[in-house]
Amino acid sequence: MDAQNKEVDALVQKITGLHAAIAKLPSLSPSPDVDALFTDLVTACVPPSPVDVTKLGSEAQEMREGLIRLCSEAEGKLEAHYSDMLAAFDNPLDHLGMFPYYSNYINLSKLEYELLARYVPGGIARPAVAFIGSGPLPFSSYVLAARHLPDAMFDNYDLCSAANDRASKLFRADKDVGARMSFHTADVADLTRELAAYDVVFLAALVGMAAEDKAKVIPHLGAHMADGAALVVRSAQARGFLYPIVDPQDIGRGGFEVLAVCHPDDDVVNSVIIAHKSKDVHANERPNGRGGQYRGAVPVVSPPCRFGEMVADVTHKREEFTNAEVAF
């Protein structure tokens, strides 16, 4: 067995062990045991690795799918927990740094904005934005609105009304960004005419966790978004044990032209795919045997690896705010 195969096997074994430990937890709500296991999981998954999760055996694939579901549930509970903590402050937006992964959202949103500005024809100066799968902590919308798109209006969609109620409370004291944020409880499958109003649509990584679900969402967006509108899809090519992977060719088949694909090798966990709805691209047409167009990955320089800093920062904040929770 060569060194690369040994590395892959060692990682899969480690992830399998963590999955087994996480699956045995009585609850996925934030606690020292939950925090420690998921910190170990992120620590194992984020560094660059030769593993290709699409080529794993059936047993490992089943484990991975179960792990993604556990990650989704734990992420939802973690975000709800911190959303409630933040809502206790007079101005919650002043305390977003409490969340241990906030820096990841800052870096991911910056990357997405830079990719949009670089690759979307005509730019995105004053867009109407939809974020699908915004959750109880809509950090991405906030960072984009506050730092990159000061004139944009954001409509945030989530299936969970409780998540939207939590999210809206975070903006109650802010007269700028708060005035540009709206929250809607809806299934993306039920959005039709609404989608045509947006210049940019963001699709969160956990919308359509199963491959077949994601395969339904993207053609639906392609059928109802306006010509020329941009689509930002979060995937996880290099971190496929944490989030579902989206094939850029599936986006092409869904009625879009793929403009850029970026797989960061630093502390940004998600991959990013930038596409746009072209009047010459329709989901039901299949030029060259495909629906839509896929031009291949556009090389994007990733920022320098700050993985060690990220792990240290997350560990420090978890310890700091575990103690602080007594006050709430």
Swiss-Prot record:
Q: Which InterPro entries match?
A: Nicotian_synth, SAM-dependent_MTases_sf
GO aspect biological process, one term: nicotianamine biosynthetic process
Catalytic activity entry: 3 S-adenosyl-L-methionine = nicotianamine + 3 S-methyl-5'-thioadenosine + 3 H(+)
Enzyme Commission number(s)? 2.5.1.43
Q: Name one GO molecular function term.
A: nicotianamine synthase activity
Pfam families reported in the protein's UniProt record: NAS
Protein keywords: S-adenosyl-L-methionine, Transferase
Would you identify the family this protein belongs to, as annotated?
Belongs to the nicotianamine synthase (NAS)-like family.
Function summary: Synthesizes nicotianamine, a polyamine that is the first intermediate in the synthesis of the phytosiderophores of the mugineic acid type found in gramineae which serves as a sensor for the physiological iron status within the plant, and/or might be involved in the transport of iron.
Please state what the protein is called.
Probable nicotianamine synthase 6
User: What gene, per UniProt, encodes this protein?
Assistant: NAS6
